[in-house]
Amino acid sequence: MSNPIRKTNARLVDVISQLKAQSRDTGAAVWRDVAMRLSKSRKNWAQPNLSRVSRYAPEGATILVPGKLLGSGELSASHSIAAYSVSNGAREKIEAAGGRIMTYSELMNENPSGTGVVILG
């Protein structure tokens, strides 16, 4: 039996439930991994900067951030990035580089199996 979700943020509880359901339906472990990371305390969430995205993600990759993406650094290539939250500075820099920001549900609709998704955080 899984642990109950003890979050009070209704949006976050809904996102975690969607991720777990997608993992059950498709058998893709990537969605379950992100759901478990978001179920943890918020102080333990990933908060990578754009410089980390530029450093570690291959060009044109689909990146999944289980937390908040921050705007320090420059983005050298266009990426599709899904994150729970994105700072305003990061949003501007991603769009200026020709990248795309999407929600977890948009990413799950486009890539249900989660193949080729890079978890950064």
Regions found by a protein language model. Give the residues of each.
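Extended polybasic, low-complexity segments that bind anionic RNA or targeting/receptor surfaces
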Residues: 1-121
